[in-house]
Amino acid sequence: IQLNVKGMLNLEQSFWNYIQTEMLEGDNKYHAEGYGLQDAEKGVVFEKFPPVLHLQLKRFEYDLEKDMMVKINDRHEFPLSIDLKPFLIQEAQHEPWVYKLHGVLVHSGDLHGGHYFALIKPEPDSNWFKFDDDRVTPATLKEVLEDNFGGEMVPPGGINRHPSATAPIRAMKRFTNAYMLVYVRESLMDEVLKPIGPADLPDYLSERIEDERIQMEIRRREREEQHLY
């Protein structure tokens, strides 16, 4: 699902915006076959959501005034948990539709370039990790949420500066923000995120992992032998 960021304070507002109906009337009437032009309502309704929900935040879009593509760095908040029941048809609302955040894909940079990395919570009760190229490091909730909302930030030292300072604090625009979110339905969490054992891996992947392990062992031995001389 592609959700608007511009003009939206948070993920919930983006969902309400997505299902908002549009009136087709006046010069914009709907052409109904056999009935000609008719006043109508145009909109989207959700009958259900998948076990794993991928939400693309529209950080890149075409600016009519500038006649060019731009990156939207506006602040847009997203939660660790969201109840999507209000956005479903009435018939589906007897089920629980709470979703938990388990993945954040981030772009750091501008329209013309930048860097991509991911923040992932691999298990229901695990910590968060940052996957940045070949580096995997633990991540805090601040790194997952606040650091990727976009908008502006107070520069380092701005909050704790000396009381006698009189110059105004200038906020800095953030160019690092989330562009895709991955939520997992809470009631299906154990099934979606169940542990993967050796039997679940395809042969080609098991062989590749073993080859990489052997190569790492060879390089380790070579380094140890070099130290002997």
Regions found by a protein language model. Give the residues of each.
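Exposed substrate/partner-binding surface patches
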Residues: I1-Y229
